[in-house]
Amino acid sequence: MKDKFKGFYSPTDSQIEDAWKDGSTIFVFDTNVLMNLYGYAEQTRKDFFEVLKKIEPKVWLPYQVGLEYQRRRLDVIKDEKAIFRKIDDSLSKIDKIFENDFNQLALARRFPKLSENTKELHKDISKLVSNYKRSVKYWDDKQPCVRSHDEIRSQIDEIVSGRIGDKPESQQWLDKLYQEGEIRYKNNIPPGFKDNGKGNAKDSTFSFDGLTYERKFGDLILWKQLIDKAKESDIKYVVFVTDDAKDDWWYTLDSRGKKTIGPHANLKTEIYQEAGVEFFHMYSTSTFLESGKKILEVGVHDSSIDEASVVQFYSHLPTRAHFVRNQEQVVRPFRRRKYVGPRVVYKANPSTVEVGDDVDIDDIAKEFRKQKAIFQYMMESIRKKDKSAKDLPEDDDFNEEDEGES
């Protein structure tokens, strides 16, 4: 049966290891993998490039990936820098809450005890904010600017030099692909049918170097270029790395939660039939780093693997930002991990906060929950129509240590 339905079978661990080490393998990277490099901590980027250097002769980029990367690079840099400005703006609003909202309540005259507790809370939160701003500035300084030298691009250029595919041969070739794409998308044939909505956007098309591109067919163009490359006689194994988690690349199954089984069977079947390769496999950046660490024995940090996974998750939200509305979503993947590098360390007492090398994510989660609960309780109590003191917390309620899990 396997000879007829090879696309439904996953490779064994030994086959995957052979592909990493075989000289007839190509490693192909999607645009989103390169874009996400701008959202990583410095150590994660270092680890990524360390793995790439180990397989450098096997790395290849489709022309479509190179084009999309060059067109989007500055926008991604701009968006990443904007995150730091928005963080600073949001933190600045905290002082305004105390200066405006609380001052208008005349607490010193009406509730002296509560006024003193409010001042202490303001002082504690100000220390948290001040130290957090220091860590934010550290990472902001590490990010490239739109007009500065882009070291990330320089490293990519060095690794893929001479290993980028040719541009589409003609507009006729593209137009024929678009016609095929309409049929494929109508029948949910991967890849790219989940991008069909891009055809309705204002920037649904763009032109470059004498050719007009339809954005919704970007994945299909990439895929066709990858297959053409795989047809070369000296290529037997193809590994594709993408942070696109949609069902038009991956076969997923809802079994006690959504689970990714592997590359879509249609994709594997198509490349086996069209290119005659023996092996096709796909990774996300995080699983690529994990396999590189295991198979090539590269010193990839666990924190880099974790961060690549989280950045992939947040890159698919409506806004690119790593702003977290539900902080548990970002904490959960890091349970029992330690980050290496400057981070804000939150101790049980909010007055003792420092920038250090190691961070226990559980401590951060606990401290945020504690401060949020205190602040929300105060605001709700103060704004009640009944301003009686019996509804307000005692002094000790604001100063006690949070020894256990909140």
What is each residue range found by the language model?
Residues 242:
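Short beta-strand/turn micro-motifs composed of small residues
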Residues 3-236, 246-365, 378, 382, ...:
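Active-site-proximal, substrate-binding regions of enzyme catalytic domains
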Residues 239:
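Nucleic-acid nuclease catalytic cores
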